[in-house]
Amino acid sequence: FAISSAALPAPAEDTAVGNESETAPRPEGALPHVPPGFAVSVFADGLTHARYLDVMPNGDVLVAELKAGKITVLRDEGGTGHATKRFVFAAGLARPHGIEFHDGFVYVGDTKAVWRYRWNPQDGTAGPAEQVTSNDALGHYAGGHVTRNLAFAPDGRHFYVSIGSENNIEEDPQPFATIKEFDAKGGPGRIFATGLRNPVGIRFYPGSDKLFAVVNERDGLGDGLVPDYLTSVADGGFYGWPYSYIGKNKQPGPLGDKRPELVAKAIVPDLLFQPHSAPLGLEFYEGTQFPAEYRGDAFVSLHGSWNSSVPTGYKVVRVHFKDGKPGGGYENFLTGFWIDGSNPAKVWGRPVGLATAKDGSLLIADDVGQRVWQVRWVGTR
């Protein structure tokens, strides 16, 4: 798949199509489809709105169960390929999403703040919750996008938090629709980049100080607009929302003429996804379990559309990288949740968070099937 920023269709102003997917039971014995040489299995099931993942130094998998307000530990005690033990790591959170292990602590982002918990390497349990960011540093949440995801800079001196907008296409007060930078010790932070309607997954490219984000763009301009995207994020960069999209393409109506000085410097993203695909998870593959050609490439979960007359997404895709930049479009990696191209889409899974397990396999959270899937290479090299 390749979408050119120079060949976008004309906007269909005020065209919104409510076309929510419908949850279907998983067909008996059904598994997602993966490329030849790979195998997929259930690592854990019976979860409550499984969203984001992180992997601890001992191999424990932490999963954010958003609607349950908790972080759960999933442990494969005997190398079985399945979580044989689970327990609550942290509870009482306000829609937790991002999880990041750093320097002996597990950092968690929810709609109130970033919190951290001392990780006990002996048994994998958590110490008391410590609030890291200042009150309202992530905005006073009153509705809108709930995801607050985290990424530590490679030098460990700062961490970054993605904060989505409160609405589809209106001006929001900061820090909504931004990525913020915080000192490792926390505090109020500063605005790092703006004009990002709903940045969700954020990750640093391996071996670099370059931050990347996947972003959910606006709805209401027709099936063909606006492409969601993957982009590197520049300090001080402006990415269009709400005044323009994909660079200097002005939002129809008065909003597009309101801040010409910002539109003039709007950055074109690096790689575009099919509009309304809803990219949520981002993982750069650094393991060795997959063939060598996968190292340095990105996996992106496309959660799937709700605002397109023709459904799209509900899959995980691979983005090829060369010299630290995405190139050549993207390709399917894990599909099959969407039953027979139905419309409205009948789905038995929707992928969200991605993480590389300690053994190098790929873990995928599924907030419809309430599972964590595991993909591993079983072919010859």
Each predicted region: which residue ranges?
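Beta-rich catalytic cores
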Residues: 46-49, 57, 67, 85, ...
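Surface loop/turn motifs at the tips and blade-to-blade linkers of beta-strand repeat domains
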Residues: 42-47, 87-93, 132-142, 191-195, ...
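Hydrophobic core register within WD40 beta-propeller blades
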Residues: 53, 99, 150, 199-202, ...
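Conserved beta-propeller blade signature
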Residues: 60-64, 105-108, 158-162, 210-214, ...
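Beta-propeller domain segments
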Residues: 2-34, 147, 165-168, 174-177, ...
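Blade-level signature of beta-propeller repeat domains, shared across WD40, Kelch, NHL, RCC1
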Residues: 355-381
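Residue-level detector of Asp-centered blade-edge/turn motifs that repeat once per structural unit
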Residues: 55-59, 100-104, 152-156, 205-208, ...
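Asp-box/WD-like beta-propeller blade repeats and closely related beta-sheet repeat scaffolds
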Residues: 85-86, 95, 100-102, 112-155, ...
